[in-house]
Design a protein with these regions (language model features):
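Substrate-binding cleft and catalytic face of glycoside hydrolase catalytic domains
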Residues: 78-96, 108-185, 306-311, 352-357
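Aromatic-rich peripheral "rim/lid" segments of glycoside hydrolase catalytic domains that contact
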Residues: 41-51, 309-381
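Aromatic-lined substrate-binding rim segments of carbohydrate-active enzymes
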Residues: 71-77, 85-134, 186-209, 269-281, ...
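Noncatalytic carbohydrate-binding groove/subsite architecture in carbohydrate-active enzymes
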Residues: 153-165, 171, 178-316
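Structural preference for beta-strand elements that scaffold enzyme active sites
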Residues: 57-59, 82-84, 122-126, 174-177, ...
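Sec-dependent signal peptide cleavage junction
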Residues: 27-41
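Boundary/entry segment of secreted carbohydrate-active catalytic domains
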Residues: 37-80
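Bacterial N-terminal signal peptides
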Residues: 19-28
Length: 381
């Protein structure tokens, strides 16, 4: 007579049932996520173009030390419909391939999202990892991991999967930004495509990647090659919309009229020893839409409240001057509004930065800038 170990059989059956329950639970949770709708509304009677749930994105990017009460005030102050919420990712140094989600920053983001929902604020959320390198002393543009394979494995499993499981799915986040300004990793297009495939397995919302600004000049052929490499990166084929940190360099002037700035967006006046770039920034941006048929979103759009705001917008004080200039900041915002507001391929913008306005927040919009921002998509579209 053959002996059967019924205990082992029961244990195996329990394991099978447990696996089935976990799978069904994951399916139910994923299915309950109400994915936002990205649509292109271009008809003979409508030139609105690309929208999310019928609206252009009018967002505010939060500094990592944002104050929740200030954030809620700024939503009304700037008449925003979206928040770009960062979660700090602790990275030991600029050559590290390891990283971990900062739990305090993650909990802060969760609490903010809960407050938005409790207030019935009807605010969309774009969630994104923010590399906090060497205690915040190094920028993400300096990060160059010593092992790319290890970096992408850890970025997927330690960072993106954590944000999806802890925040994006349970709190029905509108969009997940899988990376920002990672200039030394961006060319790893196969790894990025694999990362996006991994993300959409667990998350059914919109997915984007934010690329950094670029410079081109006909007399600098390497700059043209670098731009074309960026333009043709197939990671952009996988996202729902293309995000750009729009810190483009426009003029060498300390102050400008709005008209001069709008002209510079299509013909950069930046001058190096008598050589002018003549970069057509607007056309180079549109080329991404033409290439990939993905709408363009300014994931960061900001200018310091100083003279020379249009020279190096990513650098709050390039000439180490202390000449505060609220109007120059506002003129920069107005120039971008005039150039991009009515373009159907343009999805919207995110102001850098709101949610905290202490003295070191040189990019927080001035009152003059606030008036410009309020009238951008003031009709709700």
């Amino acid at each position: 007579m053959k002996y059967i170990n019924n205990c082992k059989t029961v244990d195996k059956l329990k394991n099978v049932i447990l696996i089935v329950i976990i799978f069904i639970s994951f399916f139910i949770i994923s299915s309950n996520v109400q994915a936002a709708t990205l649509t292109n509304d271009q008809t003979p009677n409508s030139k609105i173009g690309w929208t999310i749930d019928g609206k252009k994105i009018k967002s505010g990017s939060l500094s990592t030390d944002y104050n929740t009460e200030q954030v809620l005030n700024d939503i009304n102050k700037f008449q925003l419909n979206t928040l770009n919420i960062p979660v700090m990712i602790d990275v030991d140094n600029i050559s590290s391939s390891n990283m971990i989600v900062d739990k305090i920053s993650e909990e802060k983001a969760i609490n903010l999202i809960k407050q938005l929902k409790n207030a019935n604020a009807n605010i969309n959320v774009i969630l994104g990892p923010y590399p906090w390198i060497e205690q915040g002393t190094k920028a993400e543009t300096e990060w160059k991991p010593n092992n790319m394979n290890a970096f992408f494995l850890n970025w997927k499993t330690n960072v993106l999967k954590t944000l999806i499981t802890d925040i994006a799915v349970p709190y029905n986040v509108t969009a997940l930004n899988i990376g920002s300004n990672l200039v030394n990793m961006e060319s790893e297009e196969n790894n990025w495509c694999d990362t996006i495939d991994y993300v959409i397995t667990y998350y059914k919302g919109l997915v984007t990647y934010r690329t950094n600004k670029w410079d081109t000049a006909s007399w600098a052929p390497d700059s043209i090659t670098a731009y074309n490499n960026k333009l043709n990166n197939k990671l952009f084929s996988k996202v729902d919309f293309i995000s750009i940190a729009a810190y483009f360099e426009l003029t060498n002037n300390p102050t400008n009229t709005v008209e001069n700035l709008t002209s510079a967006i299509e013909n950069s006046q930046i001058d190096f020893s008598g050589q002018v770039r003549h970069q057509n920034i607007k056309q180079e941006i549109k080329n991404f839409y033409d290439k990939w048929n993905k709408p363009i979103f300014f994931g960061e759009l900001g200018f310091p409240k100083f003279d020379y705001a249009s020279y190096e917008p990513w650098n709050w004080n390039p000439y180490k001057n202390n000449d505060i200039n609220n109007v120059e900041q506002a003129n920069c915002f107005e120039a971008y509004r005039r150039e991009f507001q009515d373009e159907p391929w343009f999805l919207g913008f995110s102001i850098f930065a709101v949610g905290e306005q202490s003295n070191d927040k040189h990019y927080y919009p001035s009152q003059e800038s606030t008036e410009v921002i309020k009238k951008w998509y003031s009709n709700g579209q």
